[in-house]
């Protein structure tokens, strides 16, 4: 990933100037305003710029990575991560891990090209960390070896005539870096023997990935640790990173201790009294079933793709797969544990959907289940977009721009987290909310008042 170029300035701050384009690739950097219009919170020789990141899932770790990556070399930086269950212990860690930039109708999502590009870059950074000699431990060697090893692609069968016509139209605008190929039944059978195509057509994304989300997040955190260590060695400043496994009960706990507090708590954001009931988020619990095949049976094809349909199948190995996911709206249950009754209901819902496309799944045996609570954003004309921005006006602290929200990733956290984490880090380091596209700030009732430059 390339470093963002900034001109050196005495305060060590970066001041982005928004261009007419809404994408990150067109954000340009200019000299800071004259000293008379800038109120420095501290000099580089005094205390470090202190950031608290609440949450260690997709959103939180992406922000941490980009804060470390983008911060000026001369800036002393301290980043503290707070998460009661540790790295990837929430909904991010149990997500299905199917990564691609398309809607169910194979239409490129809003800013899908940028999201896909930056996700690939962050995945590469985590992969590099996973093989680094600074990373290897007895615990990590077994689990982190290949969290992106399942490069099988993803197959989406057409399930009705109306759907198929729309899919065929959208295929024409797919990304060159994540192609969508139209397959007939024979071609699909060569990839995955036994797959059933109701309309003799399927859409195959060969570059789409199947990520082990929790292992990826653990590798990304290690990458952040390595980056902080290397930056402190090579630069004239100190970059400090710490993980605190403890609960956060209210934002006021951080008042006066940090220069920026970035809330990346997913569905748990409503547990903060300052934000409870004030965000346009809906909660939805999803259960994922874990299935295995007896060793003496022929396994899933080595290069067989994962499947997206009314239920999805994320292949973990020839004799292991994950099946998901249920949608229990308005749930407040964030526990990853699944009762036998909840698991039974999930299987009753998911297996018939999956067996319609892949009948062979009936031979697989249920071995366990896990669940997560999603924070779903409102639907807009551009789709369901995450919520980003300064929240001082929301929580009643308008004196300085220091409290930030990065939430509402819903079921697309793996796709959105890299690019939006990049944007959030820029906004935090520059104290300028305008870095964030207006589409991601439109959830706020009034125009933000958090454009203070320090």
Task: Locate the predicted segments by residue.
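N-terminal chloroplast transit peptides
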Residues: 1-29
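Beta1/beta-strand and adjacent pyrophosphate-binding region of the FAD-binding site
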Residues: 43-59, 80
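Glycine-rich FAD pyrophosphate-binding loop
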Residues: 68-93
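Dinucleotide-binding Rossmann-like beta1-alpha1 core, especially the glycine-rich loop
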Residues: 96-191
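Helical element adjacent to the flavin cofactor pocket in flavoenzyme catalytic cores
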Residues: 196-260, 264-273
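Central helical "cap/lid" subdomain
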Residues: 246, 250-307, 336-347, 360-364, ...
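Active-site lid/adjacent beta-loop-alpha segment flanking the redox-cofactor pocket in flavoenzymes
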Residues: 297-401
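C-terminal catalytic lobe of FAD-dependent flavoproteins
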Residues: 360, 364-454
């Amino acid at each position: 990933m390339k470093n963002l170029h900034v001109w050196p300035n005495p305060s060590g701050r970066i001041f982005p100037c928004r261009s007419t384009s809404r994408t990150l690739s067109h954000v340009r950097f200019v000299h800071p305003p004259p000293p008379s219009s800038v109120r420095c919170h501290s000099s580089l020789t005094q205390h470090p710029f202190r950031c608290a990141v609440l949450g260690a899932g997709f959103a939180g770790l992406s922000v941490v990575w980009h804060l470390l990556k983008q911060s000026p070399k001369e800036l002393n930086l301290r980043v503290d991560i707070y998460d009661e269950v540790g790295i990837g212990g929430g909904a991010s860690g149990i997500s299905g891990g199917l990564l691609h930039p398309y809607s169910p109708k194979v239409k490129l999502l809003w800013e899908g090209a940028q999201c896909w590009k930056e996700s690939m870059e962050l995945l590469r950074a985590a992969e590099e960390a996973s093989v680094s000699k600074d990373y290897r431990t007895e615990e990590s060697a077994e689990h982190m070896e290949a969290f992106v090893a399942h490069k099988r692609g993803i197959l989406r069968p057409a399930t009705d005539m109306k759907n198929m016509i729309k899919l065929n139209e959208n295929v024409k605008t797919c990304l060159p870096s994540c192609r969508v190929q139209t397959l007939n039944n024979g071609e699909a059978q060569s990839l995955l023997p036994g797959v059933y195509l109701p309309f003799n057509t399927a859409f195959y994304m060969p570059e789409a990935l199947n990520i082990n989300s929790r292992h990826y997040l653990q590798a990304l955190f290690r990458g952040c640790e390595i980056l902080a260590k290397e930056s402190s060695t090579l630069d004239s400043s100190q970059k400090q990173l710490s993980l605190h496994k403890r609960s956060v009960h209210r934002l006021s706990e951080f008042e006066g201790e940090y220069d920026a507090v970035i809330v990346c708590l997913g569905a748990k954001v409503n547990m903060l009294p300052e934000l409870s009931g004030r965000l346009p988020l809906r909660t939805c619990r999803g259960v994922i079933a874990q299935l295995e095949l007896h060793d003496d049976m022929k396994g899933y094809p080595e290069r067989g793709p994962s499947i997206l349909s009314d239920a999805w199948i994320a292949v973990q190995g020839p004799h292991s797969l994950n099946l998901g996911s249920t949608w229990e709206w308005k749930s407040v249950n964030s526990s990853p544990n699944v009762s036998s009754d909840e698991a039974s209901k999930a299987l009753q819902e998911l297996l018939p959907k999956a067996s319609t496309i892949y009948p062979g799944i009936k031979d697989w045996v249920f071995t366990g289940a896990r669940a997560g609570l999603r924070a779903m954003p409102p639907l807009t004309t551009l789709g369901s977009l995450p919520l980003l921005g300064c929240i001082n006006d929301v929580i009643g602290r308008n004196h300085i721009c220091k409290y930030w929200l990065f939430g509402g990733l819903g079921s697309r956290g793996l796709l959105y987290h890299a690019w939006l984490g990049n944007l959030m880090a820029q906004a935090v380091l520059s104290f300028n909310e305008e870095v964030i596209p207006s589409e991601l700030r439109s959830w706020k009732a009034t125009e933000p008042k958090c454009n203070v430059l320090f």
